[in-house]
Amino acid sequence: MAKKIEAYIKLQVKSGSANPSPPVGPALGQKGVNIMEFCKAFNARTEKMEKGMPIPVVITVYSDRSFTFETKTPPASYLLLKAANLKSGSARPNTVKVGTIKRNAVQEIAELKAADMTGADVEAMTRTIEGTARSMGLVVED
């Protein structure tokens, strides 16, 4: 018989640096999950990734307090800022542009995020990522 699912917990944790401090500790502690077990497993799974990259993770907690987790691709905003070599986006994206990014870089990001996105094809996902770039104050060039 399958285990009964108790809860889903969605977090964004920096790769290779999960620890019991907030937000990980309180979120897992409320559900009775072994926090250190999650931290060790997450850090082991993300050790090959760039250190400090924010990784969305969905933790499935079962009624016997066991868990499984699934890591996603980094947020599009993080990947766009990294591709444009910027620290942050614009506070006023309609009036203040902070940088430019090439369309082929946007397409590479869309292909990387394809597993987590719901677009019909790569072209639609590329347009979605372009919209994210514009909302951050980036200009998309050909």
From Swiss-Prot:
Keywords: Methylation, Ribonucleoprotein, Ribosomal protein, RNA-binding, rRNA-binding. One or more lysine residues are methylated. GO terms for molecular function: large ribosomal subunit rRNA binding; structural constituent of ribosome. It comes from the Bacteria. GO terms for cellular component: cytosolic large ribosomal subunit. InterPro entries: Ribosomal_uL11, Ribosomal_uL11_bac-typ, Ribosomal_uL11_C, Ribosomal_uL11_C_sf, Ribosomal_uL11_CS, Ribosomal_uL11_N, Ribosomal_uL11_N_sf. One of its GO terms (biological process) is translation. Forms part of the ribosomal stalk which helps the ribosome interact with GTP-bound translation factors. Belongs to the universal ribosomal protein uL11 family. Part of the ribosomal stalk of the 50S ribosomal subunit. Interacts with L10 and the large rRNA to form the base of the stalk. L10 forms an elongated spine to which L12 dimers bind in a sequential fashion forming a multimeric L10(L12)X complex. PANTHER family: 60S RIBOSOMAL PROTEIN L12 (PTHR11661), LARGE RIBOSOMAL SUBUNIT PROTEIN UL11M (PTHR11661:SF1). This is Large ribosomal subunit protein uL11. The lineage of its organism: Bacteria, Pseudomonadati, Pseudomonadota, Gammaproteobacteria, Alteromonadales.
